[in-house]
A protein has these predicted regions:
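Residue(s) in the substrate-gating loop at a strand-loop-helix junction
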Residues: 61
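C-terminal helical subdomain
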Residues: 95, 102, 123-151, 155, ...
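Active-site loop-to-helix junction immediately N-terminal to the catalytic Tyr of the SDR YXXXK motif
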Residues: 18, 67-76, 88
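Substrate-binding pocket helix/loop in short-chain dehydrogenase/reductase
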Residues: 13-15, 22-24, 125
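Alpha-helical segment proximal to the catalytic Tyr-Lys
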Residues: 43, 47, 91-95, 153
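A glycine/serine/threonine-rich, flexible loop-to-helix segment
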Residues: 71-72, 95, 107-129, 139
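Active-site helix of classical SDR
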Residues: 38, 78
Length: 166
């Protein structure tokens, strides 16, 4: 099992104010590292290479669907690229016994919001979530555990939003 859970955000900014350095860091951490880890996992999992198959779970973001306008468009775009990787790789390696899926957390109470300069973001936006609250890392982890398990043996190229309906 591979869980790609690396992710960074930067300070809130509009696209017109984003530097090339910011974009390079965002895509290197959030997208390119996922590509490289997937590449290595396929080499170690593929039944076509004599291995036992496996499961790859990419931790994307609801931001990939929402866009994060006026805040983190670069983050959303990097996670959108991860979604496309999930689709293409799932199609490419299904016959080799590898399942590839993604989890898209929404407003989850973690330190990533503080690193982006908005430590109260989950509480501030909780009213925009149909369930009326932010989620927990444990709630995301439970979905990842299910996708990694044999209970999800016929699940590939799927996206599970853990976003309270947002």
């Amino acid at each position: 099992v591979l869980v790609n859970n690396a992710g960074v955000v930067d300070k809130k900014a509009r696209v017109q104010d984003m530097t090339a350095e910011r974009l390079t860091r965002m895509f290197t951490v959030n997208t390119i590292s996922t590509f490289l880890c997937c590449r290595e996992a396929v080499k170690r999992m593929s039944t076509e290479l004599g291995k036992n198959g496996g499961s790859i779970i990419n931790v994307s973001s609801a931001a990939a669907r929402l866009g994060s306008a006026n805040q983190y468009v670069d983050y959303a775009a990097s996670k959108g690229a991860m979604d496309v990787l999930t689709i293409g790789l799932a199609q490419e390696v299904a016959a080799a016994g590898i399942r590839v899926n993604a989890v898209r957390p929404g407003l989850i109470d973690t330190e990533i919001h503080a690193s982006g300069g908005l430590p109260n973001r989950v509480n501030d936006l909780a009213a925009t979530v149909p369930m009326g609250r932010g989620g927990s890392a444990t709630e995301v982890a439970e979905v990842i555990l299910w996708l990694a398990s044999d209970q999800a043996s016929y699940t590939t190229m799927s996206f599970i939003d853990v976003s309270g309906g947002r």
